[in-house]
């Protein structure tokens, strides 16, 4: 009886060890190497353009507005609202 429980415990331990080794090997292979990180960093930096503005529209706007295409709400002529809920200027 003792021999049977010893063998089942050792089999369970062996399976646990194999699973642990497999997990560690898979995790390590999923991480990029140092050389791959350097190449990726250089590739990302090649897209970087230090003399350009990010997210600003061009100054030649087809909308005919201001120089940069942005208008404040105070500059817009809203007019009267057709819903009667306000939002326009009262014209008395």
Swiss-Prot record:
First-listed, main subcellular location of the protein, grouped into a coarse class: membrane
Full protein name: Serine rich endogenous peptide 11
Tagged with keyword Ubl conjugation: no
Reported tissue expression: Mostly expressed in seedlings shoots and roots, and, to a lower extent, in leaves.
Subcellular location: Cell membrane; Secreted, Extracellular space, Apoplast
Assembly information from the UniProt record: Interacts with MIK2 (via extracellular leucine-rich repeat domain); this interaction triggers the formation of complex between MIK2 and the BAK1/SERK3 and SERK4 coreceptors, and subsequent BAK1 activation by phosphorylation.
Keywords, comma-separated and alphabetical: Apoplast, Cell membrane, Cleavage on pair of basic residues, Membrane, Secreted, Signal
Gene from which this protein is expressed: PROSCOOP11
Motif mapping: SCOOP motif 2: 75-89
Record's compositionally biased regions (Polar residues): 53-62
Signal peptide extent: 1-29
């Amino acid at each position: 009886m003792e021999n049977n429980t010893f063998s089942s415990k050792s089999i369970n331990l062996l399976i646990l060890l194999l699973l642990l080794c497999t997990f560690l090997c898979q995790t390590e292979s999923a991480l990029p190497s140092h050389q791959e990180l350097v190449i990726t960093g250089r590739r990302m930096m090649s897209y970087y353009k230090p003399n350009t503005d990010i997210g600003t529209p061009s100054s030649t706007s087809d909308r005919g507005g201001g120089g940069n295409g942005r208008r404040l709400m105070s500059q817009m002529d809203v007019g009267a609202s057709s819903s009667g809920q306000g939002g326009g200027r009262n014209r008395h």
